[in-house]
């Protein structure tokens, strides 16, 4: 089972089909329009576990969470939902002992009405699972996570994910608060990208104060705000106006030029960020040029998706960018995700691993 953004089930299904085939796991996706999730039915026993274990979750763009489904319950009685779940799971020898329990719903308005019930149901379910030996007495972050996903009040999927290969967030969604002084809501996209792409223990070295950053298409400053909050200095590139609150920090330089033509005077930039409304292939190529020239060491950027053929466009743009970097002998790590705060776009992160002299 994979959670995704409502309306992106088709893209999520295409992706899991491709990735499963690469691992020689065969099956078919079951897609329900606007359901906020996709089910991938494996033909062979044990293959769902193989995917949960071996399919790199971070390599999936459109999935917010993935777990192996052990059982589906379609008509749980409202007076006792626990007993049928325990009875069925007790028969499954391969079900692992878990270290955490998450009772969730897909991210749709209809399903989210069940969240209040999910919260209430968590304590009795946790006690019952512990009593049955399916859940450890104490939480253990290294053990698998037990997932119970309710799509209706009597209909749920029970399964598990591996803690080294899942999203650590409930429902796969980081809970971020919009800062009152940020110039636009887009600020949450970059904050979420930091949470998703950069391990927390590396924030002090990779997102440290005193670094220089460039924000292409910066106005009014939603992404710049995140960099300024981390005490960086920022070249803001946009023909529009920046928020006064950011100008007053003394940490930004505003360049009123086209983002495609800007070149930093001093080549001391660590971070390049970009949220320009532009053709995705053009943005991806521009990011590649910056990295190849050694003008930035890390980048986070958005690729706006077309109305049709979204998955194909994403694959093509990322493949072209990877080829461009490899041909220019750049070693790199690339991740891409359809973030919670993204709409018709995906967010890409690239860290350059080569030592490139700016030129």
Curated annotation (Swiss-Prot):
Residues where S-adenosyl-L-methionine binds? 186, 219-222, 238, 258, 275
Residues at the active site: 304 (proton acceptor)
EC number(s): the record gives 2.1.1.186
Question: What compartments host this protein?
Answer: Cytoplasm
Residues folding into a coiled coil are: none
Q: Does the keyword Transferase apply?
A: yes
Q: Which Pfam families match?
A: FtsJ, RlmM_FDX, RLMM_N
Describe the protein's quaternary organization and the partners it interacts with: Monomer.
What name does this protein carry? Ribosomal RNA large subunit methyltransferase M
- Source organism phylogeny: Bacteria, Pseudomonadati, Pseudomonadota, Gammaproteobacteria, Vibrionales
Q: Which gene encodes it?
A: rlmM
């Amino acid at each position: 089972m994979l959670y995704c953004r409502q309306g992106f089930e088709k893209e999520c299904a295409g992706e899991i089909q491709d990735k499963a085939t690469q691992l020689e796991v065969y099956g078919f996706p079951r897609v329900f329009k606007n359901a906020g999730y996709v089910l991938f039915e494996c033909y062979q026993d044990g293959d769902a576990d193989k995917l949960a274990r071996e399919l790199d979750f971070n390599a999936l763009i459109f999935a917010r969470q993935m777990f192996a489904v052990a059982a589906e319950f379609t008509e749980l009685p409202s007076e006792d939902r626990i007993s049928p779940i325990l009875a069925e799971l007790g028969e499954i020898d391969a079900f692992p002992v878990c270290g955490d329990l998450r009772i969730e719903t897909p991210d749709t308005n209809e399903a989210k009405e069940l969240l209040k019930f999910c919260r209430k149901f968590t304590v009795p379910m946790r006690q019952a699972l512990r009593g049955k030996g399916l859940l450890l007495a104490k939480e253990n972050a290294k053990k698998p996570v037990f997932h119970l996903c309710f799509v209706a009040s009597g209909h749920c999927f029970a399964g598990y994910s591996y803690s080294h290969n899942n999203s650590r967030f409930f429902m796969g969604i980081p809970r971020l608060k919009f800062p009152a002084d940020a110039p636009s809501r887009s600020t949450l996209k970059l904050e979420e990208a930091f949470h998703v792409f950069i391990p927390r223990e590396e924030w002090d070295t990779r997102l440290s104060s005193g670094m220089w950053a460039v924000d292409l298409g910066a106005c009014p400053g939603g992404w710049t705000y995140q960099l300024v909050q981390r005490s960086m200095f920022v070249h803001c590139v946009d023909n529009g106006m920046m928020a006064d609150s950011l100008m007053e920090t003394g940490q930004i330089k505003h360049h009123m030029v086209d983002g495609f033509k800007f070149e930093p005077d001093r080549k001391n930039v660590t971070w390049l960020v970009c949220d320009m409304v532009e053709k995705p292939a053009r943005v991806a190529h521009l990011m590649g040029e910056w990295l190849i020239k050694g003008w930035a060491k890390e980048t986070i950027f958005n690729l706006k998706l077309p109305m049709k053929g979204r998955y194909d466009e994403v694959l093509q743009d990322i493949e072209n960018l990877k080829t461009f970097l490899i041909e220019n002998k750049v070693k790199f790590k690339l991740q891409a995700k359809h973030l919670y705060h993204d709409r018709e776009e995906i967010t890409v992160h690239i860290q350059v691993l080569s030592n490139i002299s700016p030129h």
